[in-house]
Amino acid sequence: MQNTDLTVNLDNYDVEVNVNVKKDVAIIYSSKIQGISGLPAGSNGRALSLLSGGIDSPIASHLMQRRGLDVMFVTYLNPVTATEDTVHKITELAKLVNKFNSRNSKLLIVNFELIMKQIMEHSKTSYRLIMLRTFMMKFSEALSERYNLDILITGDSLGQVSSQTSKALTIVDNASPMFIARPLVGLDKIEIIAKAKEIGAYDLSILPGNDMCSNFTPTNVAINPRADEAIESFKNIMGSIEDYDQLVEDMIEKHITVVEL
């Protein structure tokens, strides 16, 4: 040991050296790298995320993973309008976000044509998109029961599009008693895009391929839907289906493609 008479300025230092002493090892480091932070995925339960081919839903899924959820994915498609590019893009987005799960998950690709047909025939035109989202929630609830999932996740951002106004979201919420997490609800598009670039989802999300909502949107969407008119459309659709519960069971068994991630 040698006394060099050197001094240390603890208030205005040039380099900070940290020492983390464990039982059998000591770790010495001078820099820290920020990780994704949050809670360990899977520590807070499991969720079903409604995944589209857009920018929002993958980020919503990832943010809820950071709050301790393992996430399974579902996408609703019409085989008449869904292209191979659309299916490929959604699958790749699911694979990307799945990397942040604590275990490998699944993507459920639902052929929603049977229910879409009833919506087209029995809903007021301006309420079609709201009814589509309503029945997606109802079907997602059934899937959650089948796979023992705790909550639903959507990429809704308040006021971003006509079907995401406060009144429209309230109507959709009534479709299921399950908690619907909307982690993007207060973010604007610039913030969402920044997060998409952060996890590498942005370039995938902007590839060609329309989701079902974009193909199903009428020219006159109800921006401020009335609850009584929404209930009327809902009852008309349900009345046109002979046995809704049986239809759901049949669709789960015969109209879903399961992709292991």
Which stretches of residues belong to each language-model region?
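Cofactor-binding loop segments of dinucleotide-utilizing enzymes, especially the Rossmann-like FAD-
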Residues: 52, 76-78, 112
